[in-house]
Amino acid sequence: PFLNPSVLTQLDLPIPNRDSTPLLLEPLNLNREFIPSKDIQAYRHLYALDKLEGTFWQGYIKMPLFKLHVQVYQPDTEKIKGTVFLLHGYLEHSGIYQPIIRELLDQGFSVLTYDLPGHGLSNGNAASIQNFDHYQQVLHAVHQYVKNADQLPQPWLGIGQSTGGAIWMHHLLEYAQLRKNPIVERVLLLSPLVRPAKTSWWHNPVGLGIIRRIKREVPRHFKRNNHNPEFLRFVRLKDPLQPRMMGMDWILAMSKWM
């Protein structure tokens, strides 16, 4: 459903980017109607988020380490089945999850999703993180911000893709050890990050030790990890919010987390 960014130019709309677009986000406020600015309209149009039915809110949540881009969607239905916390994977962002957001809304669920630090419209070094524990701090900060929101009724469910799945696994295991109830009642893990593929160069500690001494980031290699060629082409060639480099800090943080 995504557009070629050139369409935005034809419509006299700005193309989203990680430098200027986040500066135009307002604090997330679920207590009033959200009216997007021209730049946010462009973002929503590019990723077909403006085609979703229901009510939406968009903005940022400020926390000690990060300024996080958050989106909330509520379906047009009298009885909402619950709320899904949708977490994307590494080198992705929440905008490209429009199809699954649409499906969840059609099924009668509210949806909360956010860009991980260093991704999409959230701040932080691009495609990087200093410590995987920061992902847990972000999850808890978002939970504290929205836990009493009428738009996000119980039960709360979690969906996580790749690194998003790792975030949920970390949360569930940590809370199990503490004998505390987790944020969500159930989770759906999509290709969760458990360990890097053995074919990945950073799976080799010798290679990782050498590269970390000479590089702060390495080029990203786009893989065919989807059966939709149009989607793969958009991600590789057209999406202005796709990172082109992988941060070594993220790779090292992942290695320590494992």
Language-model features: locations:
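Alpha/beta-hydrolase-fold enzymes
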Residues: Q161-W250
